[in-house]
Every structure is written in C-alpha cells, then in structure tokens.
Amino acid sequence: MKKQFNRMKQLANQTVGRAEKTEVLSEDLLQIERRLDTVRSMCHHSHKRLIACFQGQHGTDAERRHKKLPLTALAQNMQEASAQLEESLLGKMLETCGDAENQLALELSQHEVFVEKEIMDPLYGIAEVEIPNIQKQRKQLARLVLDWDSVRARWNQAHKSSGTNFQGLPSKIDTLKEEMDEAGNKVEQCKDQLAADMYNFMAKEGEYGKFFVTLLEAQADYHRKALAVLEKALPEMRAHQDKWAEKPAFGTPLEEHLKRSGREIALPIEACVMLLLETGMKEEGLFRIGAGASKLKKLKAALDCSTSHLDEFYSDPHAVAGALKSYLRELPEPLMTFSLYEEWTQVASVQDQDKKLQYLWTTCQKLPPQNFVNFRYLIKFLAKLAQTSDVNKMTPSNIAIVLGPNLLWAKQEGTLAEIAAATSVHVVAVIEPIIQHADWFFPGEVEFNVSEAFVPLATPNSNHSSHTGNDSDSGTLERKRPASMAVMEGDLVKKESFGVKLMDFQAHRRGGTLNRKHIAPAFQPPLPPTDGNALAPAGPEPPSQSSRADSSSGGGPVFSSTGILEQGLSPGDSSPPKPKDSVSAAVPAAGRNSNQMTTVPNQAQTGGNSHQLSVSTPHSAAGPSPHTLRRAVKKPAPAPPKPGNLPPGHPGGQSSPGTGTSPKPSARSPSPPQQQQQQQQQQQQQQQQQTPGMRRCSSSLPPIQAPSHPPPQPPTQPRLGEQGPEPGPTPPQTPTPPSTPPLAKQNPSQSETTQLHGTLPRPRPVPKPRNRPSVPPPPHPPGTHTVDGGLTSSVPTASRIVTDTNSRVSESLRSIFPEIHSDLASKEVPGHILLDIDNDTESTAL
C-alpha cells in the first residue's frame, strides 16, 4: 500500500507539480509503440470483414459448411426441377447447371476453410495476443518508472536534510539508496524486455504481410478451380442449346435460321405460304388489309416456337399475310440484301423494258444462295397470287406496293418513314416486273410444300360440304364470310370425287313467280324443227376425263335417290358460267304434253361410233312435273328490242372464263374482233327479219327498266395469236427478255362460248360479270327424237314457253352462215340445259 501511495504521489507531482518525469524509451521504441495501435486496429477489422465475406457458417468443418452454403441450396433446387422437366431443353440445362453449382459450392467451402485457417486465425492472434502483450509490458514499465522516480525523489529529500540533522539519517539514506537502485534495475529489465518485443514485432511485419498474399493466392486457386468447373459445364450446355432447333425465327438472320433448322426455305415463309394457298388466294385485299394485333402477335409467337398447331389461323388469312410481312421486315438484312441495294435502285431507273429485265435477271443471279432460293420461292407464290387478281384485286402492281418495302430497304440511318419514302418507288419498279415475268426469271415449277410438313385441310370446300343450305358444319375461312359464287366455282372444280353435281338446294329457290321471271329469259323465240344432221356434231371431239367417267358408268343420265334426273357433265360445261340468253339445241321442245323423255349424253370418241342412250319413263309413273303446275302463271315474253351493245356473256361478245384450279383472267376469242362484230350484226339483222312477233309480258308487276350505262367489260388480256415467239436459250449473263407473257395460260378449248341453234337472244345490260359456280341446272325432261332425228315432243318448263317448232328459221340461217353453224355444231354439248341461274343476273322487262 505504501508503494502504491508513493506512485500516486509521484504521478501527481509529475502531472500538477514540477517534478521531473523520467523517459526510459528511445525514439525508435516510441515510434514502434505508436504503430502498434494502428496494426492492431487493422488486423481486427480485417478479421471482422473476412468473416462477413464467408457464405458458410464460421467455425465449422468443410462438410457441414458445404451443406449450409446458398449455392448448395440453389444446386439442389435446379436438380429437382430438372427431374420434373425430364427430356426438355430446359430440363437438360437445369441438370447441367445444377451439377456445376454443386461443384462450385464444394470448392467454395474448401476455400473458406483454408482462408479461415491460414489467414484469419493468424490475424486474430496478432490483434488479440501479440500486440496486447507488448502493450501490457509498456504499462508495466510505466509503473516501474514511477516507483523509481518516487524512491529517487525521497532519497534526494533525505540527502538535502542530512546537513542539519545528522542523527539517524545515514541509515535512512542508505535504505533509500538501496531501494532506488533496486527500482532502477527493474526499470532496466522491463525496458529491455519491452524493446526486444517491439523489435521482434517489427521484424515479423513482413511475415504478417504474407497473410494477405496467401489470401489472394487462395482466392486465385479457388477461382481457378471454379473456372475449371464452369469450362467443363459450358460446352455441355452449349451442345444442348445447339441441338435444340426450336429458336425464334423473327429477327434472326436468314442464314443462321436456315443453318440451325436445317431448312431450305425459312419456316415463317413456308408456313405462311402454305396457309395462304389453302384459304387466302381468293381473299380480297390480301397483304393490304391489316390483321388484328392480338391475332398477329399470337401467330408470330406460334411460328417462333415452331409449333405445328396452326389450324386455327386458316380462318384469318390477313393475319397470316401480316405475319409474312412482319418476318420479312424484321430480318436484320433484307431478303434482297444491303450489298445489292445500289444495283436494284439503278435498275429501277432504266426506262427500256428489255434492258431493265436483263439487268434484273443479272442482279437476281448475284443474290446469295439462301436469299436466292427464298426469293424465288416467294416470287413464285406472289405470281400465283396475281393469277387470281380478278377476285382478290391483288395485281402485280398492288403486290409490289404493299410487299416491296419489306423486301428491300436502305441501310443508312433515319426514321422508318424517311427510309420507306426513299425506297418504295424503286422497290415497286423492281418487284412488279419480276412478279409479272416470274416464270422467265425463275423457270420451272416450285413445290411449295418443301419440307412436306404441311398437310392440306381434310375438307377444303367448307362452304359446300352440304348443299342443303346448312352451314353450321362449315369450317376454315369461308364459314366466316358469305359463300361468294366466285369462291364456289374454284372449290367445286376441286371436288373431283363426286360423279355428279347435286342440285337439291336450287329447288327451294325457284318457287315464286317473280323469281322465275327474273331468272328465266324474257322471251324464247320459236325453235325450228331440226333433223338428225342438225343434232350431230361436225366432228368428233376427244373424250375428256369427265365424259370417260360418264361412259364408264353407263353414259346416260343418273337418277339420285330423290328421283331427280342428274346428268354427268364434261369439263367443258361444268366450270365456266353459261351465257344467260343461250338456249340448248340438244333439247328442243316439240310438244307440251309428252309422256316420254329422251336424253342424249355427251358423245365420246370410241372407235368412231357415237353412243346414244334413251331412258323412257311413263308420265304416270314419274308423277306430274312440278313445272307443269306453274304453266298457267307464265306470261308471254315481250318482243326483243333492237340489238345494241351485246352483253359480255353473249356468244359474240366476251367469252366466259376458262376452267382451272384457280380463276384466271378471261381470254378473248381467237378470231379478230372486227370479224366477230360483222357476224353479230348479220345474225341480229337476220333474226329481226325472220323472227315472228313475240308476245309481251302482261304481268301486273311494273317493268324493270334497263340501265342507261353500257355493261362493264372484264379486263383484256393479249390473245393467243398475238404472243411473240418464245425467247431462245441464251447465255445466263445476257438473257433475252420475254415478250410480256400473260399472267395465265390460254386454253383453246375454252376460248369461245358455245353458240347455239335458233335465234340470237335479246341483249340486255348486265352487271359486272362475276365467276359463278359451274353446277348443273335442275332436271328438265328433254324432248323425244323421232327416227329421222326430229323432235316429237317436249315437257314444258316454267322458265321457257315454246310456241313454234318451225325449222325454216334455222335452215335459212344455216344457208346464210354455213361456217358459223358448222363451227357451233362441233362445239355444242348435247344433253345439257342452260339456265339463268348459271349467271344469276337480273332479267329486264321493257
């Protein structure tokens, strides 16, 4: 206690008083002492932050730490998900990635254990053991110095007072002297120990710095091992990715898409073309009318994932066309390439048509192989689409306007409107002639179903699956819109599986008197009696496929289960719409109340003999004809007006369109137009001279006034005889331009409408001609032939009233125009009855 009291007294004297303070440490040791606090603080914070960097639990073994790592939990989750997704691409990816994450977690746990053992524990020892020991010795030295100073102060005081008092002082002074020497020795010992520890600490500073080198080396080693795990997993995952072909096609370069999918034609192009070939070829405004945004987005997504379930898009061809345009526009490089942009625009400025076609051909050959094949495929389809321009209104010019900017655009930067404005004019001038002359630019036929992955619809004629008027079972596009007669024509031609055409649905539409007057011709001139020579064709005709089918099945009329007579028709009279005023010479009427009927089937060339089949049915057995019940309400037809402009359906005017799988532009007659007009005028004059006075219609209904405007004419096409010679084979680099080939091939057998015996019917204005279905009329009992070829009787009909059977008119006409009758006799089809329902136009009663 006395020693402690002396220390406090000495400390107070040094602090408050003027007592001398002894400093035993050198300047170097004092500097080392100041650095100890900084080093200790650094080691403490480093240890603390390293613990925060650990993902595992601190202070545990490697296995337990591995289970607690977040990466381990992630790896387990991925592996469980991969087991649920099985063999899908995502399942394989998750499995590989889960294994990699698990391996990374194992490497991380080993790395943390090493860092904790080799780095964190030594840093903790420096901060919490070595430096505190040195600081403890420094405090001990400070206490010893205070004791030494206190003893020395007391010794000095005793030595000063010894001059006045000599009794007892020598012993006290000696005691203080010994105590002072002892305290000095302790100070020296502690000072030496402290200095040694401080110097040792400074000597180990390089060793302490090595801990951080080890930390970085451990991290580098960990990352190397982790990188090895990743490098092992990445190629495997890339292999799975490359093997999986279902990748987005929109916005992907054409070459990459074709290489990845192993296709020749891009999937969106082929899929859209096949869908449009099924239901969109006769859709008006195709590629021009926009589709619904949601429908278009859905179709693009379906094409991106390469789905084969595209049946629902058959009903919306505009969405399909929009998807095709969108794919072409979203290509990083246009189908006609940026590199050839300057050449395309220069060719568009060429005025000479021949040179322009040559330059276009040369530029097409410069396209890359993938672009050339897809461009050829697309142009062939667009040319096929343009063949039905009379229905869909998409001419080559219209197609080039709406689709051209999606095939070629400039590479320079700018707004979409600026690029389109600068490019559209040139593109239209390039695309339009290529579509017009597609067969010359790309000779040969194109198989649109290249991948054979698209199957046509099971019932393509959805509008006509039932002829009873029930459309509830119809599918695809035609169910959503009215059954236009133009579409019916193309679809009915495709129904080759039916041997006959059912006409039950027409029986319900011919009930009213007004309908019969509007459907039937306004008058029927008396037919002259004809002999056998008039009925015989001028020359044998080669049998068609339909006539062979008729002759093989009996060659005569076929009775359906309803008792209605159905006639097999040849291709010549099944497809084209018949003129409204034509009269069949094969079924003239000789009497009104005949009990027998005779049909003359189509003549087939079989060994030069013509076969004729007669079917006789008693009137009582067949039942009364429904047409005889309406005989009393039929009014006499008015006399025909003077012939004016002949309607397009007239035999002397524009001929009917030909038969084909798709509607084609109508072709003119091979004979010159002037000769046809002269023949028409002569026939009309002869008709006015020899036709007796006709009875007029006395119906109570007001007469229908004829329009004052002339009837519209269909677009003209170059005649077959006016086509120039085909270009001969030329070198590929200098092609000879075609002589403007027509859009559709001419069919000589369909270039002229059949001219019938009798007089020319009354001309009347008709609306714009439309393609009508080539379906047979309701059954009419034909007249009976006598032995010499004349007609003896005929069952009267509700649409025509025959009042005369004089044959002098026909004979006089035959004598004046022998070449016309001989030509017509070779073209008329026996056994076929033409009705106004074929054209479905209004009658005009004056």
UniProtKB/Swiss-Prot annotation:
It is a peripheral membrane protein. Component of a complex whose core is composed of ARHGAP17, AMOT, PALS1, PATJ and PARD3/PAR3. Interacts with NHERF1, FNBP1, TRIP10, CAPZA (CAPZA1, CAPZA2 or CAPZA3), CAPZB, CD2AP and SH3KBP1/CIN85. The lineage of its organism: Eukaryota, Metazoa, Chordata, Craniata, Vertebrata. It is found in: Membrane; Cytoplasm; Cell junction, Tight junction. This is Rho GTPase-activating protein 17. The keyword Phosphoprotein applies. It holds the Pfam family RhoGAP. The modification Phosphothreonine is found at residues 730, 734, 736, 740.
